[in-house]
Amino acid sequence: MKTSAITATLGAVHATNALLTIRNNDCAFFTHNLTLAENTKILNTTYHAPHTVNITSGQQNIYNSHGFCEVDATVSYGRNSTLHFSVYLPDALPYNGRFMAVGNGGMAGVLDKTALMQQLNSGFASAAGDAGHLASLNNDGSGAPDTYIPYLHNPEEVQAWIHDAIALFVPSSKDLIEAYYNKTAAYSYYSGCSTGGAQGFALAQHHPELFDGIIAGCPGNWYSHLALSFLWNARHAAENTLAYLPQTALNFTGQAVLEACDAQDGVKDGVIENPLECNFSIDSLACNATQISRNNNTIICLTPDQIAAAKAIYDGPRDSETGEQ
């Protein structure tokens, strides 16, 4: 019995190793005779066995539930710009026959490998790009006053960032999927949040033919106005000034507005259906002559400087000549 068990175990190990060899070879060679768009260049292909790739996301470690073929590539665009992207192709058995492209966050410049892995683990062939520029060359993807961000001075890279970055890598990603599985994906989807949400809106407007469905969460949309609002808010509630609004003050203000206007639509559900109909007065949160703004480290009212800052933020910037918002 022991001999039979050992023989069976060795046979299983041999079969597993043989299967890994086949999948390694499939991943390594399937792009060799593949014709992609002339501006697309394959950098490398790597096969990963199940549970061998670890992506750290906050306090969580995410492993690949399935074996997959990773294809890393670039797309050249504009006069001298490059977009990097990766495609994760799960083994045939867990593959659900569908394609999911994922977007970027913030200033982008990196691939969202957490989202890539999550979609892979859900059975999708997934792809992501860096939006056409590198965070490492752009203040590590962080914006700050008086900081030079090279890609923001390159009109082609700014255009790619929101409008075109996803569309640049999706056609080649679909070609890779078709070549690997010998058939096209049955459906193609996009998912993104914040900057990725704005990219989703741009896809629907400028590249609607690429996807069967688009998930655009919390879209950081209308960037000309959004960027101005960041500067405006920082100007009126700057840190280390009397007008500064810490998160506790923002939470206090937001909760007061919610309590005043939540039920206007007939349902008290934690959502203000129409903020423009909410006629809440920030002055109602002002500290009176006997109050201090904090009580046992809890915000209970706003100081005159904070009231002025909150009013400016709610009112927003206006055209200095016309007075229009």
Task: Annotate each predicted stretch with a short phrase.
Residues 183-194:
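Alpha/beta-hydrolase fold nucleophile elbow
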Residues 202-204, 209-318:
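A catalytic-pocket lid/entrance helix-loop region that shapes and gates access to the active site
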Residues 1-10:
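Classical eukaryotic N-terminal signal peptides for Sec-dependent ER targeting/secretion
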Residues 82-86, 111-116, 131, 137-146, ...:
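Short, solvent-exposed loop/turn and secondary-structure capping segments
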Residues 11-98, 110-114, 268-271, 281-325:
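Catalytic-loop region of hydrolases
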Residues 96, 106-182, 228:
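Cap/lid segment of the alpha/beta-hydrolase catalytic domain
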Residues 75-77, 104-107, 219:
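Glycine-rich His-Gly loop
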Residues 192-202:
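Glycine-rich nucleophile elbow surrounding the catalytic serine of serine-hydrolase chemistry
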